[in-house]
């Protein structure tokens, strides 16, 4: 619902965006609906990308381009950080986790230049 409402707001702007980046794949599903109801095509009129790479993303029409985020690893790292805090770590810690962009048909992959 949120992705749908947010996309409708963006599509109502005088200058429509070329692309919408949804916070997650579920919001992108609502975004697809709003774009299709407006009679626009993905990615011809507006590209859509999101985050998570849920299983259904590959079966949308067109298949959703999405950033694959390692959910299980995020959970493991979060627990490790919590245990460190409970054991007395009193400083901030920066953690970088691997991601992978999965290019499908909802957005064009940028050319390597």
UniProtKB/Swiss-Prot annotation:
What GO MF terms are annotated? DNA-binding transcription factor activity; transcription cis-regulatory region binding
Out of the domains of life, which is the source? Bacteria
The reply on keyword Transcription regulation is: yes
Recorded hits in InterPro entries, A to Z, give: LacI/GalR-like_sensor, Peripla_BP_I
- Provide the transmembrane region boundaries: none
What keyword terms does UniProt attach to this protein?
A: DNA-binding, Repressor, Transcription, Transcription regulation
Asked if the Swiss-Prot or TrEMBL record annotates the protein with the keyword Metal-binding, the reply is no
Instruction: Name a Pfam family for this protein.
Output: Peripla_BP_3
**Its function?**
Repressor of the lactose operon. Binds lactose as an inducer.
- Report the protein name in the record: Lactose operon repressor
Query: Which organism does this sequence originate in?
Result: Rhizobium radiobacter (Agrobacterium tumefaciens)
Task: Kindly list the organism's lineage.
Answer: Bacteria, Pseudomonadati, Pseudomonadota, Alphaproteobacteria, Hyphomicrobiales
What would be the name of the gene that encodes this protein? lacI
């Amino acid at each position: 619902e949120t992705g749908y409402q947010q996309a409708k707001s963006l599509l109502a702007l005088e200058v429509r965006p070329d692309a919408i980046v949804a916070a997650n794949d579920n919001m992108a599903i609502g975004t697809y609906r709003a774009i299709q109801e407006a009679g626009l095509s993905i990615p011809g009129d507006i590209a859509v990308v999101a985050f998570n790479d849920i299983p259904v993303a590959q079966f949308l029409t067109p298949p959703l381009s999405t950033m694959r985020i390692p959910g299980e690893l995020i959970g493991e790292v979060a627990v490790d950080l919590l245990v460190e805090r409970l054991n007395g770590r009193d400083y901030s810690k920066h953690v970088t986790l691997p991601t992978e962009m999965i290019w499908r048909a909802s957005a064009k992959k940028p050319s390597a230049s």
